[in-house]
Amino acid sequence: PLVIQDKKLNQDGSLRYPALWMDHWFGDKVMVNGKIWPYLSVKKGKYRFKLLNGSTSRVYTLSLVPPSGTLNFTVVGDEGGLLEAPVPGVGALTIGPGERYEVIVDFAGYAAGDHVLMQNSAGAPFPNGPADLLQVMEFRVTSQNGDTDPLPATVRPIQRVDPAQARQARDFRLK
């Protein structure tokens, strides 16, 4: 998994927390799995990442920035588990605190030595604050070939509930 969090650090590298309670809190550094601005070496092929926003208050709008062209996420899962079918062509993914997504990223079209950035464009506080933490992490493409198999059309078959089979119907009125 890629656990994305914003943190503030003291001069010695220890975590700095506010002395008083705050209704929301934003760090000045983005960490992925406990590291600031990390990189991951990737083969030319597909990777499945579980993304988790582990921040206290910050919302992220994540996108991938390759050396040229565009690179999109294919979403295969969310809070409810695996989706019925992959959702390709997702250019930006907005993810709130505690929220999870499972995505496929395909690095097959890139050359060894290419760098793909994962960036955040969401403001803090969301949605109208300044986008102050842009860099999240970097993927470095190696010369090795990875998984290039096509994604299945169905990730997880979902059996639909037939409303006609309900034994009892209830109406809820909220005031």
Residue ranges with predicted function:
Residues 165-175:
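Conserved, compact domain cores that house catalytic/ligand-binding motifs in diverse enzymes
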Residues 3-162, 166:
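Histidine- and aromatic-rich segments of cupredoxin/plastocyanin-like copper-binding domains
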